Amino acid sequence: TAEKHDSFISPTDGGNVIMEFSGKELVKGEPDASSFPSGGLRATFEARGYTAWDPTSYAFIKDRTLCIPTAFCSFGGEALDKKTPLLRSMQALNRQAMRVLRLFGNTDVHCVRTSVGPEQEYFLVDKEMYDRRKDLIFCGRTLFGAKPPKGQELDDHYFGVIKPRVAAFMADLNEELWKLGVLAKTEHNEVAPSQHELAPIYTTTNIATDHNQLTMEIMQKVAAKHGLVCLLHEKPFAGV
């Protein structure tokens, strides 16, 4: 995901400044798209990309900033992100599902929405140990090393007691996610050593996707406050 911050300041004819946020700014923004490959067909300053407001996803406040979820597309409407294809896929599913329902004589349903509740698995590593491993720092996973003294052969970690340090991290994580409207519901150890999981309540697909991006970001920030590092790679260690 990405961010672009705009202030609400707007100059007046008298040389003063007022706080203003227009509907035009809300509906469409114009960030830079020069980092996308163009084959050298256009100059950097002409590489326009446009943000389009996604009114179906909730706005939220993060670090005293109003965050408005948007899609990112080119001047011609081509998708420059992964959210635009998702929204179009949801519309396509709705159209075809409605068509099938009408074939069966169902005229009561007016919209079909998909929902998802993505579980987010993660590993917690002590910051001091993490700093000793350059492969973890640069790759987010180990590239070499000895086998661990304990693997995931038994169920003692999955069904074991959550360690106090991890429990404190989970409590702070839930608090921060709830502030952002992310409905974190379930947390527990996972099978591999140092692996844990957070599961939210199911919600509409595009909202759940936005929430999952927020979850991963907040996980890493909260972990740092507890002297930990959150690894989001699905298999950061060999044999996991």
Where on the chain are the PLM-derived regions?
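Glycine-rich, acidic/polar active-site loops that bind/position phosphate-bearing ligands
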Residues: T1-L232, G239-V240
